[in-house]
Amino acid sequence: MKDAGNRAKHGVSLTLAAELDWDAALVWVDDRFAYAEFRMIALAPTTGILYYVAFVDRASVRRIISLRRANRREVKHYVESI
C-alpha cells in the first residue's frame, strides 16, 4: 500500500532504495517537524540518477518513508557537498 502510494505520487517504487549507492549518499537528520521517530533524509545516486529519500533506521532494518528523483536544487546541493 505504501509502495503503491509512492509510485502514484512520485513514479518510483520504494524497492528502488535497495539499489541506491548508500556509501555515496549525503545524509542528514530530518528536523523539519517534531516526528515521533528519528527520521533521516538522503540524496543517494544509482545508475546516473540522484534520488531524494526519507527513511528511518530501526535496529538492522531501514524503513523507507518516501523516495523520489531529486530536483535541480537538490542535485546542485549534492554536487557542491561531495
Label the predicted regions.
Residues 1-82:
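Ribonuclease/tRNase effector modules and their secretory precursors
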